[in-house]
Each structure stands twice: as C-alpha cells, then as structure tokens.
C-alpha cells in the first residue's frame, strides 16, 4: 500500500482549504493539500466577488496575518468599490468583482509557490484513527497519507444534493461529485450533523443582454484594495450594471412556486437569511414591486454574466420565463441554470476555539462544514484551523472577539451554533469602532509575527508604516495651539483659553490633515500616513472609552473553567442552562455569557463558583 507522510493534511482546495494549507505551510510544517482536481483549487463556486460589509473586514484580517485571499483578490479584481463610503471608516467595507479564471490561476500559483506544500489529487474516502486521535486519511485509490493533524474543508460537498425544480441529483457543486463516504465517517464519530442549503442564479450570455437599457455601475475612481501589500489594481477595470424585477416577474414566480424545489418540499435544509432566493424574496417581501439585480461580469475574456439577486431552484423553463420578463434581459440566453444545493454541516458547538473537534486530537473543521456561508468566512476559518493544525501540541492561535472579526465569528459559532448559514456583519461586533479595515494590520500583524506566519516583505512594510505613524501621532500630540491661533487658521474652536493639540484639531469633522499641514508645514506627512492619522484622531476619544470597557470586561471574561467542570451539579441554575452549558462546554466565562438564554444572575453564580474553586485549589 502506497503511503506518504506529512505534518498537516488539508482536505479540500476551496477558500477555506487554500487558506488553511497556506497558513500551515507558512509556519514551516510539511503540508498536503488534497483535492479532487488541481484545476478546482480556488474556484469561485458562486458569485465572482470578494468582500463587502463585514466580509471585507475578514479579508483584511486574513491579509494582516499574511494570508492569501486579499492578494489574490487584488490581482484578479476587475472592479473595486468601497461600500458604506458615506459612513464612518468602522463600517466601510471594501468589495471587488473578480475575474473568475484569474482568481483561480492566481490562487493555484500561490499554493504552488510554497516549498513545503504539496498538492495531491484524489478523493478522501476515510480518516485513519487511533482511538480518538486522527492520524491521516485513506484515499479512494487505497493509498494512505499520514499526518499529526487533519483539516477538513469540504464546503458544500458533504452528501451534497443539487435541486433544479423537481429534479434532484448528487453533487458538491455543478459538475462535481459529492463527498459521501467522509460524511458517513462523521456519522460514525457521533458528530452532530444538520442540513443547510444555498443557491446560485442562472448564468447569462452577455452578448444576449440589451446593455443600453441598463443602469451602469462603475467602480471607484480611487480603488480601495484588500492587501496592505498591494499598490494598485492589476487588471483593466470594468462596469457592472443594475436592473430590477417587476410585477410580471413576480407573477411568473408566484404561479410556479409549487414547482420550486424549496417550496415544493424537496429541500429540508435552511437557506441563508441574507442571501435569499428570488422565490423567497417574492414570498417574504410580497409588498415590494421590484428587487434589484446586479449584472456582474465573470471575467475580462468571459462572455458569462452573474445576475446577483435571482438565485433559484425553479425549473429551467420558469427560470427562462422570469429572466426574460426583466428589463434588458428580454432576449437573454441562459448558459447554466440556477440551482439550490443542500449539504451536511457539523454543529459548530462541537468545536473548540481553535476549530478542533472536541473529543478528538488532530481533527479540525473550517468553512461551510461549520455552518457558515461566504468565501470570506470560509477563508478566515481556514486561516485559524491551518495555524492551529500546524501548532498541534505546541500552542494555539485563538483570535479574540475584542480584537478581530475573525474572533467574533468563531466565538459566535462555537457558543451559539447556527440555525441558518452564518454571515458576517459589522453589527455582530461589540467593539467595531476599533475593529476597522484600516487598522487590521495594527491589530493582527504583531500577533502573526510572534507566531511566525508573517513573511519578511510584510514585516518590513509594517514596521516602516508603524514607525512613520507613531512619529506622526507623537508630533500631533506634542504640537499645540491657542484658541486664537486655531481660529486665525480658520479652525473654529471655543475661546476658552484651553490649548489644543494637533490631534485635537484633527479630530474635528471639518478639519483635514492636508489643511493642518498647509497651515503648519512641520506637520507634513505622506498621503497614507495622513489618512491613517485622521482616522486615529477621529476615533481616539471613543476608543479610549471603549478600551476601558474592554479591560473591565476582559478581567472576568478570560476566567477559565476547569476541563471537567460539572455544570449539571450547580444548584441555582435552570435545567435549560445546565443542559446548554453541558452541551457547549464553554472554556471561559466570556464564552458562557454568550450562550443563548444566559442571564446575569446565572453568570454571577458561575463566577462565584469559579472563584470558590480557585480558592480551594490555592488553599
């Protein structure tokens, strides 16, 4: 029997798998990335876009740890837009349209460039175990690959079923076989499995669209990129276009709801709340007379258009009818029908904060298998699982919800579980004023440097940036003017006799760094540093208050439960909370606080119990 040995095995070459494999490889261990086909690495199975509100934050955080998604998205980007531009930096989200083929080829090139990462083609049929320790995988051809840690990133492939109207067939995505044997192996482990679903719209031939009837949507003239290492777009930039459904569209859909796989009863899994199918929109928002559709090019050399906003599981004839009822799409040709896909996922409450399956050594899960939706959420989990798999037995990388959106997501998943596919939003973070896209490197790159997953190029650029920023902020803090001097410079402040620092002046909404430097040339700084200094000044007072709250909360949040803490034996807790605490087995008081149904009184009881146990141990 053929056998190969590695330190870490990653199953799946999608967005979670590539990030996991690259992260583990950056820590210097030997990595095997096992995928059905090499050509499937980095495939964008759904929309050809990266980022967005909340999601863009995740990409920036991945990049800050020297991850690959941001760099690849910048190389493949054919349109860049900063969403929520009119709002504050804390809730702005970078987004890009990607050339699907370029994204895939650039991601493959990233994987091939890592000297200690090998790509193996094959189907994983089973996991090799010794008791509760995972020691490798068996491939369908009978060969074995061993490792001390395995990261499973199967996406929608676990017992995947594709639905188009009343027609259903097995598939992990259109044109790809599902993973059935691995799902059966998870059954044998007793893991809590559920079913979720997602969908995709029909693809259109751009040559059959009446573009002159549509509203063009250009990208930003001054594009905001994802990677702190990127200088500018690599590809020619293009426009998208906007159209809308109408009452005729809705009537066609309403008349055929019984033929939809979802409304016809074929699908058991729950779909994503924030990316509903067009059937769902028509039913749930019956008062709306139209819904927006974004027509997104799939690449510079591609004739395929992705109509974002009309995913469906209706039969092909109905898809054609409702598409052709839409302005600009009257003669549109469908090149691939839309479909829904239903798949297995593992209840993420079965995982710890390292994304390791509780009760098993060396088994990590990342991506849609954990109940999330979206490329960015998958990649962020891949980063965490890959780093922890490489650190197996030596340490852990546990991002905090106080310092990263990645930490927010993982804490939400392992504490609350999911009733529907989980999507990241800025509203999920309590400390979003300090968890901004612009400072992702300041928050996470130092941690990456300590771990050893950040390369030389990023380290040099980061250290240079921080040196200049620190110097500029010190200069602003030490520079002072009287109210009279400020008013003479056109900066309106109260004549209260109090001197203002440069940072105080810059915090005012109507004061730009450029205007300060024009009046006082000694404050000159580069465009990048000036922009960052303005943001820092704007949020300084808010963040100072937030930081005090964080420190007060952190003091109690980080108190740990002993490994075998008996929640069921605590008198004063409701049976419901005892049951939830026993199922989740939170590792810290902070994690326990976020369990659904937790009360302040119950938290006080838990804290008192922990302190009592600590006193007994130290007596």
From Swiss-Prot:
NAD-binding protein involved in the addition of a carboxymethylaminomethyl (cmnm) group at the wobble position (U34) of certain tRNAs, forming tRNA-cmnm(5)s(2)U34. This is tRNA uridine 5-carboxymethylaminomethyl modification enzyme MnmG. It is found in: Cytoplasm. HAMAP family: MnmG_GidA (MF_00129). Its cofactor is FAD. It holds the Pfam family GIDA_C_1st. Belongs to the MnmG family. It comes from Dinoroseobacter shibae (strain DSM 16493 / NCIMB 14021 / DFL 12). NAD(+) binds at residues 271-285. Keywords: Cytoplasm, FAD, Flavoprotein, NAD, tRNA processing. Homodimer. Heterotetramer of two MnmE and two MnmG subunits. The keyword Transferase does not apply.
């Amino acid at each position: 029997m053929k056998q190969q040995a590695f330190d870490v095995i990653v199953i799946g070459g999608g967005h979670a798998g590539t990030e996991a494999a690259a992260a583990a490889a950056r820590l210097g261990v030997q990595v095997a990335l096992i995928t059905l086909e090499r050509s499937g690495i980095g495939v964008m199975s759904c929309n050809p876009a990266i980022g967005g509100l909340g999601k863009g934050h995740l990409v920036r955080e991945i990049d800050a740890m020297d991850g690959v998604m941001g760099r690849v998205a910048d190389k493949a980007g054919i349109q860049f837009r900063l969403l929520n531009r009119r709002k504050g930096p804390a809730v702005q989200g970078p987004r890009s349209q990607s050339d699907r083929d370029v994204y895939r080829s650039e991601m493959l090139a990233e994987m091939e460039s890592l000297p200690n990462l090998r790509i193996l083609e094959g189907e994983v049929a089973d996991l090799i175990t010794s008791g509760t320790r995972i020691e490798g995988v068996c491939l369908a051809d009978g060969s074995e690959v061993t490792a001390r840690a395995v990261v499973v990133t199967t996406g929608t492939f676990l017992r995947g079923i594709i639905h188009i109207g009343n027609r259903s067939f097995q598939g992990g995505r259109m044109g790809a076989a599902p993973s059935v044997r691995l799902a059966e192996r998870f059954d044998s482990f007793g893991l809590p499995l559920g079913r979720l679903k997602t969908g995709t719209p029909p693809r259109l031939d751009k040559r059959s669209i009446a573009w002159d009837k549509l509203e063009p949507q250009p990208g930003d003239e001054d594009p905001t990129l994802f990677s702190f290492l990127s200088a500018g777009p690599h590809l020619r930039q293009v426009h998208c276009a906007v159209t809308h459904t109408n009452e005729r569209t809705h009537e066609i859909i309403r008349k055929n709801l019984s033929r939809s796989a979802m409304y016809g009863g074929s699908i058991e899994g729950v779909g994503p709340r924030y990316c509903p199918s067009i059937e769902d929109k028509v039913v749930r928002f019956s008062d709306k007379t139209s819904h927006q559709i974004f027509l997104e090019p799939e690449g510079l050399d591609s004739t395929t258009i992705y109509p974002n906003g009309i995913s469906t599981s209706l039969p092909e004839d109905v898809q054609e009818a409702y598409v052709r009822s839409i302005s600009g799409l009257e003669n549109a040709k469908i090149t691939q029908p839309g479909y829904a896909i239903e798949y297995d996922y593992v209840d993420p409450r079965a995982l710890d904060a390292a994304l390791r399956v509780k009760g098993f050594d060396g088994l990590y899960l990342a991506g849609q298998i954990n109940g999330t939706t979206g490329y960015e959420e998958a990649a962020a989990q891949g980063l965490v699982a890959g780093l922890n798999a490489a650190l197996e037995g030596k340490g852990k990388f546990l991002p905090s919800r106080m310092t990263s959106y990645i930490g927010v997501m993982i804490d939400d998943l392992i504490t609350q579980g999911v009733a529907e596919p989980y999507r990241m939003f800025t509203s999920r973070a309590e400390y979003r004023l300090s968890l901004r896209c612009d400072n992702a490197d300041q928050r996470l790159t130092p941690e990456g440097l300590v771990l050893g997953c950040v390369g030389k190029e990023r380290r040099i650029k980061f250290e240079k940036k921080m040196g200049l920023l620190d110097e500029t902020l010190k200069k602003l803090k030490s520079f002072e003017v009287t109210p009279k001097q400020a008013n003479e410079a056109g900066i309106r402040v109260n004549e209260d006799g109090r001197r203002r620092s440069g940072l105080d002046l810059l915090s005012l909404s109507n004061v730009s760094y450029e205007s300060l430097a024009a009046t006082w040339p000694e404050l000159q700084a580069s465009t990048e540093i000036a922009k960052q200094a303005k943001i820092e000044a704007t949020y300084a007072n808010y963040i100072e208050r937030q930081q005090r709250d964080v420190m007060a909360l952190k003091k109690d949040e980080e108190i740990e439960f002993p490994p075998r803490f008996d929640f069921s034996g605590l008198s004063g807790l409701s049976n419901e909370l005892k049951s939830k605490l026993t199922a989740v087995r939170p590792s810290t008081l902070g994690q326990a606080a976020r369990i659904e149904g937790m009360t302040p009184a119950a938290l006080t009881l838990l804290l008192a119990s922990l302190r009592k146990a600590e006193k007994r141990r130290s007596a």
